[in-house]
Amino acid sequence: MLNYDIYDRQRITLHCSIKLKSPLSHIGEVSGNVSNLKTIKLIDLEGQPRSCFVYSGNALRNGILRRRGTAAALDNLGLEVNPDVHHTLFAGGRIDGSTGSDMDLDKKIRQLMPWLSVLGTAKPAGVFGVKDAQMVHGRINVGSAYLVCYESAPYIYEQFPGLLPVESLEGLRVLSDAKQALSSDPFSHPSSDAILDYANAKANYLPGLKQSLKSWTQYLLVDQTTRRDSTHDPELKRFLPGGKPTEGQLSLLGETKPKKDTEKKSDQMIASDRLIMSGATLYSRWDLHTTQVETGWIVDTLLRFAESPYLGGKGNRGNGLCSMEFWFQRGDERGHFLNISTGQNQLSEPAQKAHNSYQEYLTAYRGFLEEASASELKGFLGGAG
């Protein structure tokens, strides 16, 4: 068994800044041929519920960490898995029977699969050689990425104010302090002075904040595309039956008799997509309770993501290209953690140290697999190495 202490864990908060290099698509709902962006309701600076664009934490967690990170780990170790294990690793599994609480299984998973320890899963019955289904709790919370804008300003100011425009910070501070003073003693009615201070703060600072902090709708753009009917293209009609194939061209359909021309409904249509414009910034908070090896796996996965850093849908059109910057908090310690961008990755000392630990773990892992003719892991995963 690998000599790896799964109980030596630290709590780390990563503050993630996402800079869009091309427009971003993240669809919340589709109405006809119109794709609408995903939004949630937030309480804005005026205390009113307002819609705001978010890139869901689930999309970040699964799109970057679960799919890319798990695939990279299996590639590194040369492992294959059976379909049930594949679903458990890449799709989060399922609960399909009575649940158990096998602590030895939980320990084994965290020793042999740090990526699954980080992400968690719902282990179906029979998977990993254990009869009962079981929840494996993850060690990371990935928050949704909020567009930095007027609607999200109260939340981002509390979490990571450095992402907000410099000219907005004084007004946000005064408003935040005045609002907190209203509820300093929740057992009694706020004082008349506190109420007046809050009213004055809104009157004095809200107009300027609306100028320096743009509404999320000002980052919105509409991309209309025409999906053409290929059967109406004169250059492509020749590939249809009866379309006069060129010399030497054989029909894949065999001989066909000419048919009378019939009216066919055109497949041509105009599609309309909502996108968040290039240059916008999003903020996501990640909370980790991880070992050094698990943190190193996260760093390694982010470096893999940097090889093709696209978020959201419609990447085939170049949408979703981005760069990411992470800052960390660990107790009273805080600082820069990691930058990822195509060809321009930068690792801080803590990030590099964690990544080195993960690479050393992989080296030991390969030795563990080579020494075991009938590896415990191979039976565990139900596949062959």
Question: For each of these PLM feature ranges, what is it?
Answer:
Residues 1-385:
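RNA-binding basic/glycine-rich loop and surface signature characteristic of RAMP-family CRISPR effectors
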